[in-house]
């Protein structure tokens, strides 16, 4: 039983159900929400406690009851002073019931975990309800992180939350927070509104286009090399590129962080360093994307540096050799990777005119070391 449930303050009928001596049939009836004489708040407290029972049947019955509470019971409970553990159970079951979310946010004993669960599962409206409670956001910065990383939360809401964090010197643990924080200083912050703004619709439409985009599963890329050796967008990608081009820097950063493979592979080539870096920092980026990017001469040295610093990516032999061969890779990183290349590739690189003189020399030195050894 949760420590914050004060059984002695519950009515006698509820205390009897929660006592160790209570008969199994009585507990099972209570798990179904049947507790004669108990108020709605007390019923929900008891059912929430039983949902954590060691008895699988009892716990399953209680959880099913919580998920389908009759409106009078649920509404009555939402006016009571519920313990934090009960608020947590309701947050798990009703994260997108906007009436429930509104009531839970007003409760003094709501905890961080309950807020995080609601933020994680929030739809657009629920996200707005949570985010507008600035006092709770400042007390629980991890909830800001959850809302930012939830694609269903409006773009304008995410911007407001980043601005709030920056204004109060909060350091958020989101992948590209440094970039988002720098970008937000130059953005117009929109007030909360009932209807989504143009920026919100744009962000959603871009993500939908990106999700529908069909890219090669093994070698995904939004670009192809033309006859002159220059990268250009594939025709199928042009509508998505047009949407992304309309975005502000902060919008692009979030799209690069949370978006589809197509969005990342376009935005990693963005001329704005903040946007491109956010794309390569995305937790959604996979090894095959890193391999494509590390071979591109259209990305910045900042992007290549981030790939070189990522141990998960540099486990890939293809990423290693791409970074060594790419003239835009900072020399410090490319030379560190040379000892990890195969002898056959070292011999090819030692004679290649497509690598810089410094890399060619470092490769030859590595071969010489191996020959002497």
Segments from the language model and where they lie:
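Alpha-helical scaffold segments
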Residues: 1-373
């Amino acid at each position: 039983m949760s420590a914050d449930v004060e059984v002695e303050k519950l009515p006698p009928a509820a205390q009897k159900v929660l006592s160790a001596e209570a008969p199994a049939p009585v507990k099972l009836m209570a798990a179904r929400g049947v507790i004669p004489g108990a108020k709605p708040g007390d019923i929900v407290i008891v059912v929430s406690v039983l949902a954590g029972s060691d008895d699988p049947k009892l716990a399953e019955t209680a959880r099913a009851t919580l998920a389908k509470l009759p409106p009078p019971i649920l509404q009555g409970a939402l006016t009571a002073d519920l313990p934090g553990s009960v608020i947590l159970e309701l947050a798990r079951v009703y994260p997108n019931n906007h009436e429930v979310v509104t009531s839970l946010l007003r409760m003094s004993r709501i905890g961080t975990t309950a807020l995080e669960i609601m933020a994680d599962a929030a739809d657009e409206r629920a996200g707005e309800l949570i985010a507008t409670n600035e006092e709770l956001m400042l007390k629980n910065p991890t909830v800001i992180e959850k809302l930012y990383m939830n694609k269903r939360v409006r773009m304008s809401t995410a911007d407001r939350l980043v601005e709030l964090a920056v204004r109060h010197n909060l350091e958020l643990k989101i992948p590209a927070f440094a970039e988002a924080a720098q970008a937000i200083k130059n953005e117009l912050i929109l007030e909360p509104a009932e209807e989504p703004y143009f920026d919100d619709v744009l962000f959603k439409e871009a993500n939908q286009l990106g999700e529908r985009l069909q890219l090669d599963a093994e070698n995904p890329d939004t670009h192809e090399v033309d006859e002159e050796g220059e990268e250009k967008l594939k025709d199928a990608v042009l509508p998505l590129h047009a949407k992304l081009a309309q975005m502000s820097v902060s919008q692009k950063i979030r799209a690069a962080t949370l978006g589809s493979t197509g969005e990342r592979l376009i935005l990693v080539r963005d001329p704005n360093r903040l946007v491109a870096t956010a794309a390569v920092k995305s937790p959604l980026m996979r090894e095959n994307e890193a391999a494509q990017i590390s071979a591109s001469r259209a990305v910045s040295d900042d992007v290549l540096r981030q790939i070189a610093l990522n141990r998960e990516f540099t486990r890939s032999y293809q990423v290693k050799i791409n970074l060594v061969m790419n003239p835009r890779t900072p020399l410090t990183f490319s030379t560190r990777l040379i000892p990890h290349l195969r002898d056959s590739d070292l011999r090819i690189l030692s004679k290649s005119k497509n690598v810089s003189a410094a890399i060619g020399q470092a490769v030859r030195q590595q071969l010489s070391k191996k020959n002497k050894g």
